[in-house]
Amino acid sequence: MLAVVLAAGLAAVTPTAAAAPTTTPQCADGWQVSTVVEGVGNLENLDSDGAGRFYVTGIVDGFLAHVDSTGRFEKLLTGLDFPAGVRVAGPYVYFLTGDGLTAAPGTLQRYEIATGAVTELLTGLNGPNGLLLLPDGDLLFTTIGVNAPQTGIGRYRPSTGEYTRTWSSLPLTNGLALAPNGRSIYTDNLTMRIFRIPLDAPESPVAIAGIPNLVTLPDDMEATRSDTLFVADHAFGAINKVDTRTGAACAIITGLIKPGATRNPPDGTTSVRIAPDGDSWALYVTAMDGTLRRLRPPADIDLTPATPTR
């Protein structure tokens, strides 16, 4: 999530504090939207266990929660300080705290699913935000804090505890996704652009999408096997579909923002994951309006995820 202090900056992008219609082209035909759970606070991030269940974070209410296959919502941890990115890895759920431009120093923590035990792995992080599990088991996380010198993207190896504070120095980054080749990742930052970063050359990011093709305040994201990227939009409450080869983009849904008097822009969508939906795949989306939604694609769209563990 981008801290509320970004509201002033958003006003420079949109005519008013209310969400204006995105100028990104629309491609919503054929997509079906349903609700998994609603009314559970400001949802910041999610991940799937691959078996119809999800782990979500609530940034304002400070929780890590579980959503089962029937939609039953249960808080597992409370009292967390601005929890953000979350990833399931075997018997563990990794998550970040301290998300925000001016938040207090944050942490990377590990929750053991079987016992509920929590282990603090890293402290003193500079506004940690997005989290990604790599095929080799390492974790990448983005940082957006401005209270200290920029730290870019960090890398942590759970098997040994090895930590690289600045794996990539690309600043003010947010979402993360693995590319289907397994040799690069995607990320975005406050310049409103999306980048590809080779895993073997983290200081060589290449911008692949942005204004004018994509007008967005990009948040978390996920890629498909065919290298299509789906990106949450924190400004307009959209999910944008991005062609990573050309930079062309379109919105499959918009307007997922807080209603009326509860608005506090930016307050749109925050994360998107591809997860099983019966024998097929669907997008699952969190938003600041407290709803976890399922987006089923048209028949001609293959959502097979890039991430092998899905």
Pin down the residues of each PLM region.
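A short loop-to-beta-strand structural motif that recurs across blades of beta-propeller domains
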Residues: F63-A65, G106-Q109, T151-G154, R193-F195, ...
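C-terminal closing repeat unit and adjoining cap/tail of repeat-based domains
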Residues: A235-G290, R296-R310
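Beta-propeller domains
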Residues: V56-E74
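Beta-rich, blade/repeat-based domains predominating
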Residues: V37-F54, G79-G106, T123-T142, N147-Q150, ...
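Short loop/turn segments that connect beta-strands within beta-propeller blades
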Residues: V67-R72, Y111-G116, Y156-G161, P198-E203, ...
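Blade/loop signatures of beta-propeller domains
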Residues: A20-G30, G58-D61
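Secretory targeting and sorting signals
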Residues: M1-A20
